[in-house]
């Protein structure tokens, strides 16, 4: 994560663009402060990148020594903040992942697609991918539980904009 470069999203060497607005930057910085206050250890990032004075940039941030009771593990941050929570085994990892009121996105990090599939079927998120996040506007995107308000993308994303009309006609017309 420390090697990720923040900057102009039109620059091909950049992996992380700015947040959308000042309010969101302040919100993410508040979560970073809360993580520190609650005892999580900052391993990478946590500040504003140097040299990016225009825009709402925050460094990719990794917390370790996180447990599932901490705010940074319980809430959707919507910023480049990752909380690494240790698990005893695969079943414990699934339990931790599902112990949340949210379920927008998840990832299973493994080189074994069959194992990724088996774990993904147990995790209650609207989207889950092997080895990281993926997005395709042709496929529905949205969450479970308290995450999101429906689906974006794909046929499912169009359905809320449609009205069904049933018309009955006599065959003789």
Predicted regions and their residues:
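Conserved C-terminal structural/oligomerization subdomain of aldehyde/semialdehyde dehydrogenase
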Residues: 2-5, 16, 32, 37, ...
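Conserved donor-nucleotide binding/catalytic region of nucleotide-linked donor-dependent transferases
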Residues: 8
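Short linear capping/connector segments at secondary-structure termini
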Residues: 11-17
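Short beta-strand to alpha-helix junction loop
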Residues: 18-29
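Diglycine-centered glycine-rich loop/turn motifs
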Residues: 41-47
């Amino acid at each position: 994560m420390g090697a990720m470069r923040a900057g102009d999203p039109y620059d091909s060497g950049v992996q992380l663009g700015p947040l959308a607005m000042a309010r969101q930057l302040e919100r993410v910085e508040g979560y970073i402060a809360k993580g520190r206050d609650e005892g999580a250890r900052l391993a990478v990032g946590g500040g504003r990148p140097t040299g990016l004075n225009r825009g709402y940039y925050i460094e990719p941030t990794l917390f370790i020594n996180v447990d599932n009771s901490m705010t940074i593990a319980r809430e959707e941050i919507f910023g480049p903040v990752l909380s690494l929570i240790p698990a005893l085994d695969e079943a414990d990892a699934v339990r931790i992942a599902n112990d949340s009121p949210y379920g927008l996105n998840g990832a299973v990090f493994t080189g074994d697609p069959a194992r990724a599939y088996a774990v993904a079927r147990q995790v209650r998120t609207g989207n889950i991918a092997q080895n990281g996040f993926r997005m395709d506007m042709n496929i529905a995107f949205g969450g479970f539980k308290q995450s999101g308000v429906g689906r974006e993308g794909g046929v499912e994303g169009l359905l809320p904009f449609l009205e069904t009309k049933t018309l009955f006609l006599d065959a003789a017309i």
